Amino acid sequence: MYALADVNSFYASCEKVFRPDLRNKPVVVLSNNDGCVIARSPEAKRLGIKMGLPWFQLRSMKFPVPVIAFSSNYALYASMSNRVMVHLEELAPRVEQYSIDEMFLDIRGIDSCIDFEDFGRQLREHVRSGTGLTIGVGMGPTKTLAKSAQWASKEWPQFGGVLALTPGNIRRTEKLLSLQPVEEIWGVGRRISKKLNTMGITTALQLARANPTFIRKNFNVVLERTVRELNGESCISLEEAPPPKQQIVCSRSFGERVTTYEAMRQAVCQHAERAAEKLRGERQFCRHIAVFVKTSPFAVTEPYYGNMASEKLLIPTQDTRDIIAAAVRALDRVWMDGHRYAKAGCMLNDFTPTGVSQLNLFDEVQPRERSEQLMQVLDGINHSGLGKVWFAGR
């Protein structure tokens, strides 16, 4: 059995924890540089505020009550996520952090001493008393069914935020799946759900009753695995250690439009520096560095321009100096004067766990001497609270 604990309206709830005066008031959290809405409290949702709504539009809208907006504070959200994780680990021996606000728990054998839903209520109270955050808990014999149960616990308040789908109550599971739209199933996106709908499959129960071989032939092995999971066959195990990332992206929308190359170069260098820090945090090396720039697609009076360029390195690196240099070379290939740029970013790909590659004695490019040691010292200073060391390109 698995349980999925999901923090309700996570970003907005984190802001409310430290502002008791905002209880029952509509709160939204804005993206980097206050570009658009990325999180809403339940009260804000009831006002009809949509995800992705630009801040300048929201600011001019009229509501029956004031809407409180916060700039995103990712350090706070990471800290609160870690606190939730710690409290869950106090009651469950094996926990997987699926996302910043979702955690899977292995709860096999729990029912020998406590009812599953009673345990879910215990989890809710333990997290609420320790962090001030409210979680919803869904339980099932597979991860997909636990996710479906968690969806239902949010959809119908009468469950009190806790719902268990057990192997001994097949009728309850089938009833829930008959009410769950296929697009709400974990791992089924909008594109796949549209194709399923054309085949007459509109609910989770209909998908569960589909032939797995037919699904694999017409879609892929991932959707076939989902079908098996909906039927109680566990195909996705708990990952206590998160898998290594395949890509790192650092980007930001500008508060004011960027019109000069120097300002853009500084922004790209800053993104490249942060991406390199994340790369070392993953204990990875990369060979592929890409930079993208674009103007606002909403600026009707200005021509739209967006472009991306990439650099492939001969030697995998995690050295900030190499990554910044490659990012600047990529920027030089996409920069065009005369535009008012709204966003830029840096992406790292093609990861390897070590920086070792086959070299030629006559290669012009050789690995930097003592590069890893220098980066370790740099990261140690920046994370120690003693100060901040950065590169001159910023």
Regions found by a protein language model. Give the residues of each.
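A short glycine-rich, hydrophobically flanked beta-strand micro-motif that places a catalytic Asp/Glu
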Residues: 135, 139, 287-293, 342-345
